[in-house]
A protein has these predicted regions:
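Acidic, histidine-bearing metal-coordination/catalytic regions of metal-dependent phosphoesterases
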Residues: 1-16
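Core catalytic region of metal-dependent phosphoesterases/phosphodiesterases
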Residues: 13-16, 20, 25-109
Length: 109
């Protein structure tokens, strides 16, 4: 019997799996983060036609404090791009890192 907590991903033929991590948006400053966010979005645009699954495995953001009732301002480009990709059928799995632990179940909500 398969553990119900384990998700089995079926790959589409001729599609790839991508593992992304350590964007650290928010550090060291707003300008650097904006430039990095734009590069990440361009990369996601390049891979969207051959991606089956994307795993974001920690530290997408870089915040050393917890948000319990609000969402940090900014990064709408990246969040919108991730929504666009999931709407197109690409599975995205997000794991929190030590710099973005506040995320917890943000994407599920």
């Amino acid at each position: 019997m398969i553990n119900p907590k384990i998700t089995i991903c079926r790959l589409q033929q001729q599609k790839n799996i991508y593992f992304l991590s350590d964007f650290h948006l928010g550090a060291p400053n707003a300008q650097s983060s904006l430039e990095r966010e734009k590069r990440i979005c361009r990369f996601l645009d390049r891979i969207k036609n051959d991606a089956s699954v994307i795993f974001i495995v920690g530290d997408m953001f870089d915040f050393w404090f917890e948000y319990s009732t609000v969402v940090p301002k900014g990064y709408v480009r990246l969040l919108g791009k991730l929504a666009e990709l999931t709407d197109s059928g690409i599975a995205i799995h997000f794991f929190v890192g030590n710099h973005d632990t506040w995320m917890k179940n943000y994407f599920q909500q």
